[in-house]
From Swiss-Prot:
Coiled coil, from the record: none
InterPro entries for this protein: CLCA_chordata, CLCA_N, CLCR, Ig-like_fold, VWF_A, vWFA_dom_sf
Name recorded for this polypeptide: Calcium-activated chloride channel regulator 1
The organism's taxonomic lineage, starting at the top: Eukaryota, Metazoa, Chordata, Craniata, Vertebrata
Domain VWFA: start-end pairs: 308-476
Length: 903
């Protein structure tokens, strides 16, 4: 038997929280700190707030009983946008913000329906990103479609908080069980119903029983499961929480391990309740003695305020080395001129061993204000490092301007150590301020991340990457949810150019952007000659670029009005007698407040990595809430010593990627080079008209119920709304986006280059089908180490028993794979074999699974289990019109290929 590597080490790491900050705490069985944020584009409506309160109140009781008296909602904040009128009952927010909220209320993009869903793309047990409710869902009666709003909220909360998945499958609504019966994909199998085809015309609908497809053995396309309204089954909330009888999650006893749903695929066939009980929330939480929640939730109404930002910049002696002061000033100038939105209040503090307020808060109204603030950037570096004095001066600059520190932001940049940071931790906690930290160089204080993590701020690290600071400042954009206030970075490139040489480049500007567009060039020795040409041939020269007045070696051009759509071309000439480094940075904003731009965001799966366990790089590329597909996404990770690792990210539903074609691009990272801070940036690029939008409904959502059977009669709900917007286009233009993913910290790694020694990733997309008397298999190739390189060999086993293969893979019949040579990770694998020594007859049912082995003789987890049934299709006119009760259909003579993502 091939030895296996115990994978508990890195699977445990996946259960740690990801990069998104959350202020939610579970204390004495009650959840505190939940934020429900309303998007600024949502019209003011008092009923919306009232319905949110009613939803959460109902959800609290439902959650309490569903978790067997373990948890309930105690304190919830509703964040109201600045676009709404002020009221006396509205309080000032602290660290609460739209971009960090657990729940957002926002309109769908392209009228794509009102299904509540959770953005969730991590592994089993990992928290999701946010829950999305539309105003229409909260304001209209959707009781027949989703059940009550409170129940739908609990369904989504389970996705968000505990990392469990849906127990239905819209793509594969039926499967053939090991008893050779057609079953609806559901949990539990005790939920009863009827299968029908629904046909609607002219406002009326009729139904007929489903027929079996003579080629697959399953029901025909568009066959729909209609549940009985009156049920006795109590499970499961992750299938159909709308049923009155459903009040629990599926347990080990009631779980349907055969169902081809995402819960089985992602959680190795574990029940939802088993995953919930293994969460950190429940490990030290005992059931309460009360039969009902102790209290109803308490709500705080918070109204967003205008943005308040204070720069707290290090000018200690160490900042004079490696051009750090220059680089800091270049990046800070870019932030002040190009990133911070107009109407914001901005202040500046510098510090060494003492601190000085350079600017009290000043409202950004025009270019003169920008110039007045940037004129105070520090020109000399000397003295020691006192971070606490810098922070306290930042608080003072805010308070002296009659503003509250609550909800204000501080951008703290330093390259030095400070042993006294602990002395102001409590003051930082009480201030309510949000601190974004930028560590410059390997000696920056190790406590910086504590400040950003505890206040809900971003964390960044910059070292050898000359654009690292610029990328960090560019990422600190508005947190309000308004698309017009977001700065979008199109280019950030550093170019080492020899003397008297030209370098050329292109930047695509697509039709979703173009407002407030800047081209910025920096240099290390002498200003280069600059040529820039727009898509219509208009040229801009060096004289058009405005040089800064601070001698920080930067020049910028602001494109008047809206930048032309198409490809912009730039050329730079190093006219100095020596080589120098030139940088090009391009930023812009949305073209229209009604059309969301294409955006890219990135983060690591956790803030702290422990060698040799892997971490996952995630990048989300979307337009509004629609995924963008078919593009090249590249991650660049810089280690503490300045070494760069480049990874191509994939959206192929294999390896680190949970779901194919969901706009989430991901990859494992294992190339560790010592301990310390690592930084992440991601470049997303669409060229040659390859990009397209996905108009599919999102994953991880409350099921849209087509109707119910009541007293023997089918009562249909309105059909799910289709995308009807004339602007909905599957194809989108070429574009370029660059974003910083912040930083993460590595521990336990030896010095030098020591990539993790780990097994290949688990295969999760194995498919099988019969071709005459052979079985054809297909899957996505894993790698030598997770998803990097290629595996050494495969183990394929086959059984007639699903449970035997699942529980005792090593003793199932081995398939001869001597002719099978693994391909590079991410490639399509295909293999055909004759299932010997089994006798093959009509109705013979096989289950197959695969393991991959790497060159270190480490084996992957067992793949999902694929099913193949041998059958001879019946003549079309002999196929009976079946489809009444789900449990009554025997398929002994049918065969199909299907994925049962079980293990």
């Amino acid at each position: 038997m091939v030895p296996r590597l115990t994978v508990i080490l890195f699977l445990t790491l996946h259960l740690l929280p990801g990069m998104k900050s959350s202020m939610v705490n579970l204390i004495n069985n009650g959840y505190d700190g939940i934020v429900i944020a309303i998007n600024p584009s949502v019209p003011e409506d008092e009923k919306l707030i009232q319905n949110i309160k009613e939803m959460v109140t109902e959800a609290s009781t439902y959650l309490f009983h569903a978790t067997k008296r373990r948890v309930y909602f105690r304190n919830v904040s509703i964040l109201i946008p600045m676009t709404w009128k002020s009221k006396s009952e509205y309080l000032m927010p602290k660290q609460e913000s739209y971009d960090q909220a657990e729940v957002i209320v926002a309109n769908p993009y392209l009228k794509h329906g009102d299904d509540p869903y959770t953005l969730q793309y991590g592994r089993c047990g990992e928290k999701g990103q946010y829950i999305h409710f539309t105003p229409n869902f909260l304001l209209t009666n959707n009781l027949p479609i989703y059940g009550s709003r409170g129940r739908a909220f609990v369904h989504e909360w389970a996705h968000l908080r505990w990392g469990i998945f849906d127990e239905y499958n819209g793509d594969q609504p039926f499967y053939i069980s090991r008893r050779n019966t057609i079953e609806a994909t559901r949990c539990s199998t005790h939920i009863t119903g009827t299968n029908v085809i629904v046909k609607c015309q002219g406002g009326s609908c009729i139904t007929r029983p489903c027929r079996r497809d003579s080629q697959t053995g399953l029901y025909e396309a568009k066959c729909t499961f209609i549940p009985e309204k009156s049920q006795t089954a109590r499970e499961s909330i992750m299938f159909m929480q709308s049923l009155h009888s459903v009040t629990e999650f599926c347990t080990e006893k009631t779980h349907n391990v055969e169902a081809p749903n995402l819960q089985n695929k992602m959680c190795n066939g574990k029940s939802t309740w088993d995953v919930i009980m293994n969460s950190t929330d429940f490990q030290n939480t005992s059931p309460m003695t009360e039969m009902n929640p102790p209290t109803q939730p308490t709500f705080s109404l918070l109204k967003s305020k205008q943005r308040v930002v204070c720069l707290v910049l290090d000018k200690s002696g160490s900042m004079s080395s490696e051009d750090r002061l220059f680089r800091m000033n270049q990046a800070a100038e870019l932030f002040l001129i190009q990133i911070i939105e107009k109407g914001s209040l901005v202040g500046m503090v510098t510090f060494d061993s003492v601190a000085e307020i350079r600017n009290n808060l000043t409202k950004i109204t025009d270019d003169n204000v920008y110039e007045n603030i940037t004129a105070n950037l520090p020109q000399e570096a000397n003295g020691g490092t006192s971070i606490c004095r810098g922070l306290k001066a930042g608080f003072q600059a805010i308070i002296q301007s009659q503003q509250s520190t609550s909800g204000s932001e501080i951008i703290l940049l330093t390259d030095g150590e400070d042993n006294e940071i602990h002395s102001c931790i409590e003051e930082v906690k009480q201030s309510g301020v949000i601190i974004h930290t930028i560590a410059l160089g390997p000696s920056a204080a190790k406590e910086l991340e504590t400040l950003s993590d505890m206040t809900g701020g971003h964390r960044f690290y910059a070292n050898k990457d000359i654009n690292g600071l610029t990328n960090a400042f560019s990422r600190i954009s508005s947190r309000s949810g308004s698309i017009t206030q977001q700065t979008i970075q199109l280019e950030s490139k550093a170019l080492a150019i020899t003397e008297k040489k030209w370098v050329n480049g292109t930047v695509p500007v697509d039709s979703t952007i173009g407002n407030d567009t800047f081209f910025v060039v920096t240099w290390t020795i002498k200003k280069p000659e600059i040529l820039l040409q727009d898509p219509k041939g208009k040229k801009y020269k060096t004289s058009d670029f405005k040089e800064d007045k601070l001698n920080i070696h930067s020049a910028r051009l602001r494109i008047p009005g809206i930048a032309e759509t198409g490809t912009w071309t730039y050329s730079l000439l190093n006219n100095h007698a020596s080589p120098q480094i030139l940088t090009v940075t391009v930023t812009t904003r949305a073209r229209s407040p009604t059309t969301p731009p294409v955006t890219a965001t990135a983060h690591m799966s956790q803030n702290t990595a422990h060698y040799p366990s892997p971490v996952i790089v995630y990048a989300q590329v979307s337009q509004g809430f629609l995924p963008v597909l078919g593009i090249n996404v590249t991650a660049i990770i810089e280690t503490e010593d300045g070494h760069q690792v480049t990874l191509e990210l994939w959206d192929n539903g294999a390896g680190a990627d949970t779901v194919k074609n969901d706009g989430i691009y991901s990859r494992y990272f294992t190339d560790y080079r010592g301990n310390g801070r690592y930084s992440l940036k991601v470049h997303a690029e669409a060229r040659n008209n390859t990009a397209r939008l996905s108009l599919r409904q999102p994953q991880n959502k409350a099921l849209y119920i087509p109707g119910y059977i009541e007293n023997g009669k089918i009562i249909l709900n309105p059909p799910r709304p289709e995308v009807k917007d004339d602007l909905a286009k599957a194809e989108i233009e070429d574009f370029s986006r660059l974003t910083s993913g912040g930083s993460f910290t590595v521990s336990g790694a030896p010095p030098g280059n020591h990539p993790s020694v780990l097994p290949p990733n688990k295969i999760i997309d194995l498919e099988a089908k019969f071709k005459e008397d052979h079985i054809q298999l297909s899957w996505t190739a894993p790698a030598n180490v997770l998803d990097k390189g290629k595996a050494n060999s495969y183990i394929i086993r086959i059984s007639k028993s699903f449970l035997d293969l699942q529980k005792d893979f090593d003793n199932a019949t081995l398939v001869n794979t001597s002719s099978l040579k693994p391909k590079e990770a991410g490639s399509d694998e295909n293999f055909e074999f004759k299932p010997e020594p089994f006798r093959i007859e009509n109705g013979t049912n096989f289950y197959i699974a695969v393991q991959a082995i790497n060159e270190a003789n480490l084996t992957s987890e067992v793949s999902n289990i694929a099913q193949a049934i041998k059958f001879i299709p019946m003549p079309e006119d002999s196929v009976p019109a079946l489809g009444t009760k789900i449990s009554a259909i025997n398929l002994a003579i049918f065969a199909l290929a299907m994925i049962l993502s079980i293990v």
